[in-house]
Every structure is written in C-alpha cells, then in structure tokens.
Amino acid sequence: MKYIAYAFELTHRPDELTLETAYDLLSAELAEIGFESFEQNETCLRAYIPVSTDIASDIPALLEQFPLPGLLWQYSSEIQPDINWNEQWEKNFFRPIRIEDKCLVRAPFHPTDPDIPLELIISPQMAFGTGHHETTSLMMSYLLDMDLRGLRVLDMGCGTGILAILARKLGASSVTAIDIDDWCIRNTGENAALNDIRDIDVRIGDASLLADCPMFDLIIANINRNILLDDMSAYRSRLGNGGTLLLSGFYTEDIPILTECAEILGLTLSETRSRNNWAALRFTPDSPKR
C-alpha cells in the first residue's frame, strides 16, 4: 500500500509546552481523521496516511482548531513507496515499553526480559495501541492494578488488541473486542496469536453491536471524547451491577463533560489518572435504590 507522508513542524509554541507533548497531541488529532502511523524526531512529526484516504483539505482546519492555543505549524507532504513497518519500528520505536515494571510490551524482534513477570508481543504496525501512547499505558496501568480473574470483558475500539490481550492474560474468563476498522480486526487476531491467545471474540462494527451482546463485568473504551459521549449509554446498558467502566482517549479538560454524561447514566467516577494532559477515568454503577 502506498502512503502519503506529511511532515509537521512546530514553528512557535509556549515555553511551558514541550515539543514531545505538542507532537503527541497532534498525533491523536491526526489519528482521528485517518492517519495510521507517526514518527517523531527533533525537527518534525511525520504522519502517514494511505493515498486512497488522503484528506489534505481537512488539515488546515484541524491545525486552526488545535485544542492548545499559541501554536503555529507548517507542513509538507510527499508520496511514499510501500512502507516496511518492521524497519520503521526498529528505527523509531526500538525500545520495549515497561508498564510499572509489571508488564513488558515488545515487538517480535525485541528480546524478552526475565525480570518482568508479564509480556505482550505486538506486531509492528503503528504507534498507537503499543503502550507508547499515554492513553494506552494509562489503561494498561488500570488493568494491571485490578483482579480480572473470571471477569467478562469488553474492549471497544480495540485497535491492535493490546488491552483485550492483556485482559485475557490477566485471567478474564471471556474477552470481546470490537472495532470499526477491518485492519484493526486483522491486527488484533494476529497479535492475539503472537501471544498464544486464540479465544478472543473479535468483531467488526460499532456500539450498535452491543444490543446483541451479553452483560460484561468490565468495559474498556480507549477511543475519543465525541465517540465516548455518543456511545456511553450503550456501554452502560451492557455493564453489570458491580462492574467497571474504563474510559480514555481524551484530554484532562474533557473530564467534566464525560463525568457529567456518566452521572446522568447512573455511573460514579471512582478514580482519575492522567499523564501529559491525557486522562483515563474509572466509573462504577450507582448502587440500586431499595
């Protein structure tokens, strides 16, 4: 598949904002409009999108409406030949990721680490859903701190399948993984096989599929603010009494609107975690009234 590579350079930013944080935020915004992979260096952020889905006309508006003020961008683009994602990962994401020294996320070409009790092997495809991004690592930290043994788990917007795979490795009795992108469905299956997991129920679709799903003890959704707001009622309808809803994929300034939506649906915010302006929330259902 041929890609268009965009190079985004930040020409002005507030002193208190690091270049890495600005590029992370831009990566998240670009991912929402179809960009599939990203590389950061000291001079620019390179973002890749398939030629068939290039949306060049949307980029100026995205930069003008960027969620942080005071930033000025310039960018260029060029058509790339077929990309070797293994080579890209070896050049740009060559170090495995440790999550709280409890879990190692590595590509197949990384060595194992006997000092880490749990490892996940993720095939090199893109930077999101590998543990490198804050939202993924925040959600993983929640899962690693929970007792998932025997739980029925739903992963909405599964991406690479990393959270679904982790849940199964942590003892979940069943895991359902849903995504609207057929690439994600294939990659989740591939990554599950790399981790010797064969029983994740992987489905293509959106929250409308939940009408035919059973109840779940834990629902994970690492997507974006707008989809979470639109679909939270569907999540709530499938969340059993005493269950847990974990949400991420948004900024800390989005916490109030998401919390308000959850409270209307009978959910209570029980914990907040954040890193570099990204947030992850834990909700539990309100106790039934007697």
From Swiss-Prot:
GO biological processes: methylation
Keywords assigned by UniProt, alphabetized: Cytoplasm, Methyltransferase, S-adenosyl-L-methionine, Transferase
Transmembrane among keywords: no
Annotated signal sequence range: none
Binding-site positions, S-adenosyl-L-methionine: T136, G157, D179, N222
GO CC annotations on file: cytoplasm
GO molecular function, one term: protein-lysine N-methyltransferase activity
EC id: 2.1.1.-
Keyword Cytoplasm appears in the UniProt entry: yes
Segments traversing the membrane: none
Primary localization: cytoplasm
Catalysed reactions listed for this entry: L-lysyl-[protein] + 3 S-adenosyl-L-methionine = N(6),N(6),N(6)-trimethyl-L-lysyl-[protein] + 3 S-adenosyl-L-homocysteine + 3 H(+)
Subcellular location(s) of the protein: Cytoplasm
Gene3D superfamilies: Vaccinia Virus protein VP39 (3.40.50.150)
Family: Belongs to the methyltransferase superfamily. PrmA family.
Primary role: Methylates ribosomal protein L11.
Protein name according to UniProt: Ribosomal protein L11 methyltransferase
Gene: prmA
